[in-house]
Structures are given as structure tokens and as C-alpha cells.
Amino acid sequence: RSFATVLKLMEEYPEYKFMSSQAQLYAFVKEDYPEVYEGIKKMIAAGRWEVEGSMWVESDTNVTSGESLVRQFLVGKRFFKDEFGVDNKIMWLPDVFGYSAALPQIMKKAGINYFMTTKISWNEFNKVPYDTFMWKGIDGTEILSHFSPSTDCFDEGDCWQTTYNAYLNPEHILGGWHRYSQKDLNKEYLCTFGHGDGGGGPTRDMLEMGHRMTKGIPGCPKVKQEFAIDFYHDLEKEVKGSRRLPKWSGELYLEFH
């Protein structure tokens, strides 16, 4: 449903760009809905549909063995390369319940340079102090990480939880900017919008609002639609060599569930 909706909206909104992870989803669509799959391939070739995420599925990382995690990257990246000619560079895990300290090393050896999530904001007791930082693994490997701060909350003391299901409207965009912890380091943040966790994707209302916000609304940050990998490339250039770029060593433990 989400993929078919996206293809329809792309016909109506030429500036609209979309990203989806999880090779397994594409494999299902290829087998069951070949006409949708061909439409996806056309949009990828046109530079409007981004395939990223690197893993076969958005995998658990707490109880999963190291070999299984390696195979998630191996099989996932191979599928995206063979089917679409894309070499993934982002580990995209917006809704996974904690992140093993072994991941930075595995990611780097798999050719992954960047990490994204929002779930860690669900901590029950301690707010993770950073949204943009270097994540240091067990062996010392470091990965540039960014937690999407999208939220409709404006009270900085209470804005713990963020969402990957943001509405593309001034409330969520401005709320995310208030919530973003590294404004002294970087002047942009990544906002993922649309109906997820059940599917549906973005709506016409969101795209109409996004079109207007691209032009600028007084008192609200401007938005632009671009691929996640482009955001990370710009982020890396912005923070590279900065002494203000914080580091987090070890496991990213989720204090919830």
C-alpha cells in the first residue's frame, strides 16, 4: 500500500522524494506486484526514490549474534546492489529497541558510514544527551550518527520522545528544531515524515504543506526534500574536525519495554 501510494503521489508532485529501507519488502513487492516493482525501479533511476538502510530487515541487535548481523548487511547490501545498482552507506534503524556496541565495527567493515534512529528517545529515565555525535564501538571504531529530533513538543525539558512518523507541518518542524541538541554544531536536522508503523506513507496534505514550507514560513525553519544520504554527506562536511562533536562509547541501551 505504501509503495503504490508513493508512486501515485510522485506523478502529482515532481519535487517529492521518498526513501524506504528493508530489502525484504522490495523482494515481496517484486514477487507479488511486479508492476509496482517496475514503477519503483523507474523512480530510482530518475533520482526520486532512495533505497537505503543496508540490512535485509530492520533487525533486532540485542540478542542477535554477530554472524547474523554480518549477514543482515551482506545479504541486504547485495540485494540493493544487484537489483538497483546502489551501494548502501546508512544503517537505518528508526524503531529498534537498543543498539549493540558491536555495531560500529560491523558497520564499518560492511562499508557503512552513517547511523540513524529515533527509538532511543523512548528512554524512560535518562535522556540521551546528543542527537548528532560519533558512536564509538567496542574496538574503537567510530560512526557518524544522527537521531532525528522530530516532535510536536516545545517544552525542552519534556521533549524526550521523537518520532519517525512526523507530520510535515510547522508544528513538527519547529518542534524538532527546538528539540535538536546540536544546534551549535549544525544548522540542519533530518525529519522523516509520513504514516509508518502500519504503513500508508505521506499524504497529499503533507506534500502540499511541504511545498509551502519550502518557500519559507515566518518563524519556522525552511524545509527541503532530499535523500538521506545527501543529508549525511552535508552533515559530515559540517562537523568534520569539530572539537564540539560529542562521542558516545559503547551500547545504546533503550530504557523501555
Q: Which stretches of residues belong to each language-model region?
A:
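Catalytic-domain carbohydrate-binding cleft regions of carbohydrate-active enzymes
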Residues: 1-257
